[in-house]
């Protein structure tokens, strides 16, 4: 989950304050076991962060009731997130990294922070309801001898990456269903960059724009 909308990891020396900037909370790491059905429910809950694409939209928009730190992207599997579909039906083509379809009874070990584990995955809340089988807790405070997630990030950079990291994108997932005209989308992006259009702002700074730019918005330009 993204914990800050303003943090950046700039080229150069990485300092402890950089870890605190990109990960603002004192979370620890939990290790859970879940089956394919549970994983899909988790992913569908996260995918509700996006508003459903509607004809005429030329940018994506976000559910303004969902704070950005409640959105999780997933590694270790491949999937499409279809924003033309309603929440609960958006995760498409979910496979293992080798292309095998994920089945409901497949077993996964999933790393999440303690907040997500205790508020959503190990209790009945938004994702799982009474009667559902909950994921199994395998370990709390993983590598607690090192510290929390901030410290684990630093440890990973030092010991696994040899002290140097470079930008890398897995490309294991993508947004689909944004069926806009490419020229209209590019025009909207140009107008936004020129300051001739602006994205909507929400009262809660922890949420993202809840209104898409539309063909009607760009028609006057």
Region annotations inferred by a language model:
Residues 186, 190-221:
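Extracytoplasmic Gram-positive cell-surface binding/anchoring modules and repeats
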Residues 1-195:
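Catalytic centers of hydrolytic enzymes
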């Amino acid at each position: 989950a993204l914990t800050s909308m303003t943090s950046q990891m700039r080229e150069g020396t990485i300092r402890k304050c950089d870890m605190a900037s990109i990960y603002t909370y004192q979370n620890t790491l939990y290790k859970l076991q879940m089956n394919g059905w549970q994983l899909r429910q988790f992913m569908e809950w996260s995918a509700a962060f996006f508003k459903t694409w509607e004809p005429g939209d030329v940018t994506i928009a976000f559910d303004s009731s969902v704070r950005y730190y409640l959105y999780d992207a997933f590694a270790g599997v491949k999937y499409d997130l279809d924003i033309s579909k309603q929440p609960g039906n958006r995760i498409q083509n979910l496979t293992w990294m080798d292309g095998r379809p994920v089945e409901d009874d497949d077993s996964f070990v999933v790393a999440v922070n303690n907040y997500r584990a205790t508020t959503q995955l190990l209790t009945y809340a938004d994702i799982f309801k009474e009667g559902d089988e909950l994921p199994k807790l395998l370990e709390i405070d993983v590598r607690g001898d090192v510290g929390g997630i901030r410290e684990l990030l630093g440890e990973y950079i030092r010991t696994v990456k040899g002290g140097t990291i470079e930008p890398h994108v897995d490309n294991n997932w993508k947004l689909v269903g944004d069926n806009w005209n490419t020229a209209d989308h590019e025009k909207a992006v140009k107008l936004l960059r020129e300051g001739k259009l602006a994205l909507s702002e929400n009262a809660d700074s922890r949420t993202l724009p809840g209104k898409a730019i539309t063909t009607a918005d760009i028609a006057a330009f």
